[in-house]
């Protein structure tokens, strides 16, 4: 147990106060106009574009509340089923102008089956070449309500699997949903981010346990808990779910400060910075750099 200036306030040090707001940022704050997060989003978009199947495919999107990934896939001509965790989020999805006969969901709980037929984005949404978007209400942590081998690909962007504390179980469900040869792209919190957040919260006991821990969980001020991974652990978790790992790499390598300085000096460098970042991330495959890791895996067959 620690005491003195570095101790946790709950251990009795009256002079210690936790920070009012976290300084270690896990993702773009709502409404952020920070150029770094615009850069980050564009890097994620390029990485997704390079990963997507070339032929039109049926894709399950469990990337949380942000719909930018689903719309990008629709624009590329894919049939996308997007899982929404809360019923009220369905009303926030923009309606396709070509589908004006759609109606809001009925009051009460909407099942996955009925939600799947309620809101469909027809051909041409977001410039899609025959792509379509359907949104369903359900728990992305437990996907047993989909039929086996229903999808050609699964996207778990936006740190989605870091919020699934029993990640192994969720990945086993994803394996079941993928057709043989189907692929998975995921993004999770890195161990580097987890260590930084634990240090910021002065959780020294948890930090000292990390080398011996099988799973590293990090609490947030709002009560949520996320799981972070190092590359070897992520590979082991994917392999245990009978998925073949194509690669594991950092989402970003360049520091936020370096990106901001470069953009402040010359905004026209934005495309070059994005391409450089994507190439650097691929070169640093297997390394735990930056706040997030991305991984590509597939069901054998």
Stretches with model-predicted labels:
Residues 2-57, 68-75, 183-213, 259:
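Conserved class I S-adenosyl-L-methionine
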Residues 152-166:
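A short SAM/SAH-binding and catalytic strip from SAM-dependent methyltransferases
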Residues 223-242, 248:
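Short alpha-helix
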Residues 168-183:
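A short glycine-rich, Lys/Arg-flanked "PGG" loop and its adjoining helix->strand segment in the class I
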Residues 236, 246-301:
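A C-terminal cap/extension of S-adenosyl-L-methionine-dependent methyltransferases
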Residues 60, 66-143:
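Class I SAM-dependent methyltransferase SAM/SAH-binding core
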Residues 141-154:
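A short acidic, Gly/Pro-enriched loop at the edge of an enzyme's catalytic core
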């Amino acid at each position: 147990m620690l005491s003195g200036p570095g101790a946790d306030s709950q251990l009795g040090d009256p002079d210690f106060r936790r920070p009012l707001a976290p300084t270690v940022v896990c993702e773009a704050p709502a409404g952020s106009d920070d150029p770094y997060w615009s850069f980050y989003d564009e890097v994620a978009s390029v990485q997704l574009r390079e990963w997507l199947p070339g032929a039109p495919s049926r894709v399950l999107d469990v990337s949380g509340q942000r719909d930018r990934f689903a719309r990008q896939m629709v624009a590329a001509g894919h049939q996308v089923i997007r899982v929404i965790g809360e019923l009220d989020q369905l009303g926030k999805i923009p309606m396709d102008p070509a589908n004006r006969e759609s109606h809001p969901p009925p009051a009460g709980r909407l099942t996955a089956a009925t939600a799947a037929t309620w809101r469909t984005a027809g051909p041409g949404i977001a410039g899609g070449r025959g792509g379509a978007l359907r949104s369903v209400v359900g728990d992305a942590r437990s996907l047993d309500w989909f039929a086996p081998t229903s999808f050609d690909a699964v996207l778990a962007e936006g740190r989605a699997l870091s919020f699934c504390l029993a990640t192994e179980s969720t990945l086993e469900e994803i394996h079941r949903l993928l057709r043989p040869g189907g692929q998975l792209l995921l993004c999770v919190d890195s161990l580097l981010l987890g260590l930084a957040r634990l240090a910021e919260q002065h959780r020294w006991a948890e930090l000292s346990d990390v080398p011996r821990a099988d799973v590293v969980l990090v609490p947030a001020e709002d009560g949520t808990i996320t799981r972070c991974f190092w590359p070897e652990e992520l590979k082991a978790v994917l392999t245990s779910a009978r998925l073949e790992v194509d690669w594991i790499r950092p989402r970003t390598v360049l520091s936020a400060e370096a990106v901001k300085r470069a953009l402040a000096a010359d905004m026209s460098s934005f495309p070059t910075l994005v391409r450089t970042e994507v190439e650097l991330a691929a070169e640093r495959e297997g390394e735990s750099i930056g706040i997030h890791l991305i991984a590509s895996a597939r069901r054998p067959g």
